[in-house]
């Protein structure tokens, strides 16, 4: 690969509806004008402050799937499946931007990579408006004041996250990572990582749709859920892309075997990008509600959460932050 090119990818321009086209206009003059070929690029991804990096990068690091993601030298690194080739990205928070180092297999994928990274880190959120709404609740106000600007860790691949959400049902973070790593080793697409220990792209639904269920070290009911999900994703019966109607996607997910409210809402929050998704039955949310004197039964907490709309996914980040868990701490 050639020398690193430094680009400032403006947050406001990239947040508009034609984000990819705007990004192309910004970056093409800085790259060689060849139609294809690999490239190494360094970008600054600005955001509207404040941004609390602890839960954002802590969550990504604590749940990293070996071979696909890692925390290395102060950066979250992962592989990316892009239109023309695979890529590796390293992301590190700074005071007013996120450093983004891309190793692209094909330079034509630069705009797509920028868009995915901004989506993953929720960089186009408006923390001022969100925090103002949440801080109006006396129980949440101290949490917002302590660490303003919490973002929702999202995903670069909605299908990947949906599969991982199923693998994470009713198991520890470590167990979920182990199950996902086995899928990656068996079915992922190998990729070269010039700077670290990443080895694969996460397998796409088509690669998983034909797998032998006996190879999954999961309870039989969970195997059925995984296979039903990947079949629906591979066939297009379920579309988790950015243009998907949220309630339609929720309804299709609910129709799958093994999909309860927690799984549907976690996918809505992380994969579909619904800012109002609310997994009210999540154990961490329930424990936080109890500690704050909020109602803790699902129905009562759902009623209380109406005051946080349309930003309940962000309220969840503040509630989760009350717990002592690695997802709340950015690694050194």
Model-derived segments and their meaning:
Residues 1-332:
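HhH-family (HhH-GPD) DNA N-glycosylase catalytic core used in base-excision repair
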């Amino acid at each position: 690969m050639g020398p690193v090119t430094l680009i400032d990818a403006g947050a406001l321009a990239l947040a508009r509806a034609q984000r990819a086209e705007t990004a192309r206009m910004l970056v093409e003059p800085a790259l060689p004008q060849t139609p294809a070929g690999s490239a190494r690029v360094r970008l600054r991804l600005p955001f509207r402050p404040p941004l609390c990096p602890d839960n954002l990068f802590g969550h990504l690091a604590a749940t990293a799937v070996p071979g696909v993601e890692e925390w290395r030298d102060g950066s979250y690194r992962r592989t990316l499946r892009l239109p023309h080739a695979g890529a590796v990205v390293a992301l590190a928070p700074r005071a007013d931007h996120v450093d983004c180092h891309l190793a692209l297999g094909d330079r034509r994928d630069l705009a797509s990579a920028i868009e995915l990274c901004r989506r993953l880190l929720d960089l186009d959120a408006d923390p001022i408006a969100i925090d103002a709404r949440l801080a109006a609740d006396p129980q949440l106000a101290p949490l917002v004041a302590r660490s303003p600007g919490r973002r929702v860790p999202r995903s670069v691949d909605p299908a990947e996250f949906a599969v991982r959400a199923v693998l994470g049902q009713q198991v520890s973070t470590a167990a979920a990572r182990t199950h996902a790593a086995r899928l990656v080793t068996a079915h992922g697409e190998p990729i070269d990582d010039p700077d670290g220990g990443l080895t694969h792209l996460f397998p796409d639904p088509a690669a998983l749709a034909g797998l032998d269920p006996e190879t999954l070290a999961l309870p039989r009911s969970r195997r059925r859920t995984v296979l039903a999900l990947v079949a629906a994703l591979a066939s297009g019966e379920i579309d988790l892309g950015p243009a998907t109607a949220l309630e339609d996607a929720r309804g299709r997910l609910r129709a799958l075997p093994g999909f309860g409210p927690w799984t549907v809402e976690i996918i809505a929050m992380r994969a579909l990008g619904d800012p109002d998704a609310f997994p009210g039955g999540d154990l961490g949310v329930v424990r936080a509600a109890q500690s704050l004197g909020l109602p803790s039964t699902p129905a009562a907490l759902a009623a209380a959460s109406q005051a946080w709309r349309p930003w309940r996914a962000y309220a969840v980040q503040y509630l989760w932050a009350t717990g002592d868990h690695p997802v709340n701490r950015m690694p050194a």
